[in-house]
Amino acid sequence: MIALGIEGTAHTLGIGIVTEKKVLANVFDTLTTEKGGIHPKEAAEHHARLLKPLLRKALDEAGITIEDVDMIAFSQGPGLGPSLRVVATAARALAIKHNKPIIGVNHCIAHVEIAKMFGVKDPVGLYVSGGNTQVLALEGGRYRVFGETLDIGIGNAIDTFAREIGIGFPGGPKIEKLALEGEKYIELPYAVKGMDLSFSGILTEAVRKYRTGRYRVEDLAYSFQETAFAALVEVTERAVAHTGKDEVVLVGGVAANNRLREMLRIMTEDRGIKFFVPPYDLCRDNGAMIAYTGLRMYLGGVKFNLEETVVKQKFRTDEVEVVWS
């Protein structure tokens, strides 16, 4: 079977086409602003403007027509309301016009599910992006969130720090490069609260220290990464210990960071378990993960009528009964 998936929870519009074992196309376009941040109305306008050309590009890349597609999947949430509505409307229109079944997909679950295309079975997932930071795993037929940020996502924290020190957006790659030149660890707040995390304190203190002019920016970048990533690894390891699972998967835009990968690799090697990171174009927000998860849901017997395709801005992973795994 062939599935087409549309992703549009935030500032990236993605369209993916997959089979059960292969990505046939995975194209996207991201709205970028000079200072970073996302205005929901602008993101929605971006998605509406680019949907048709991106759909054509995906179909051309896959070498198929829309009639060859067996089902349509779309990101139902969580995310920005205006962006989600553009994507849902487009998915409904395609499904109705071409008489295809439609499936609404939880964006966070899709980030973990795409790893299963590569042989991952039942992992603890660390999902780290601009707006989301979660440790989740399948337990009792639902994806349970074992730990998450209580304030801002790790990606937003890094981007905000980068903006405050004047190196622009996106900040992730620039902070990572600066951190490689760090020589001294500077103490910053380490905020793990039970199984949850907080990044506002480390961000505020790192910016405060920078403004004093007494610290090298390279050392601050290094210390920011070491402190924040150690907290992420700690909560992930706790989830592994609690669930007894023997796989960890790293997903989301921040999965591109090599230091975070290294720290997780060390932890998993120490525990004698597997560690996997999907190709980066499948880690970031993308349509292929939506298509793949929607296809797995459909093959597992999940059915949607049009009334069930309303968007869910606060869509929790544990709202979804996982009958397809």
UniProtKB/Swiss-Prot annotation:
Gene name? kae1
Residue numbers binding substrate: Y127, V128, S129, G130, G131, D159, G172, E176, N257
* GO biological process, any: tRNA threonylcarbamoyladenosine modification
The domain of life for this entry's organism is: Archaea
Q: Spell out the protein name for this chain.
A: tRNA N6-adenosine threonylcarbamoyltransferase
Which compartment or compartments is the protein found in? Cytoplasm
Keywords attached to this entry: Acyltransferase, Cytoplasm, Iron, Metal-binding, Transferase, tRNA processing
Example GO molecular function term?
A: iron ion binding
Which InterPro entries does the record cross-reference, listed alphabetically?
ATPase_NBD (IPR043129), Gcp-like_dom (IPR000905), KAE1/TsaD (IPR017861), Kae1_archaea_euk (IPR034680), Peptidase_M22_CS (IPR017860)
Q: Where along the chain is Fe cation bound?
A: H107, H111, Y127, D285
